[in-house]
């Protein structure tokens, strides 16, 4: 990632970077792109630790520090008081676990246990046996799409009935394909759901389906779609204000003033370059993702 960032930074014809995907890759790139005064706009690097590394960092990603509390608050609204947290034992999973646990306990709930697993695990019988013995009334799932789907499937097979809620990566057709009927009732955080999209969002859903053989876009697809338009919008405004010229610096200044109506909401950035916003709660109903209704 660092080598790629340096290559882009050294090429004066490249004015901005869209990405990277993983927090670890973005962290390696930011000092380089920052020194080069090159705007870097991400949609999926979510760790709080990235904030403040570079004045040229902009983030549309759903952030760990906000998602954990959202999951906790959702369970509290549902009257849940006893949680178990299952988390992938990496920076992402640990950060999400910590933010969930802190908020759930602040709400008056009890975290019975926080149980780690490895991203490469496929058999979760051991940790799910622990979960079942603790008898929680809710489960916070802090991992990624594939491991999350396997945990959901195996938990239901073992008779664990507590509601499960996780991060935006669980809004994926892959989860339903892997977990099957066990995905019914799953809750997850998100910024977009095809079934609840407005007119602009529905137009995107239709075009996406036409392009990709009927596939339904998930939240990451919607964010990436908006990402490109946010960059284009900023470039257009910067050129208008600077006699048709566009540089990395003027593009960055335009990004700071962004107020773009996208399919995922109105995109704006705070002083740290973060998009501070509310998140949706999604659920699987009749095999499809929809907005959760209280």
Predicted features by range, described:
Residues 1-294:
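Extracytosolic ligand-binding ectodomains
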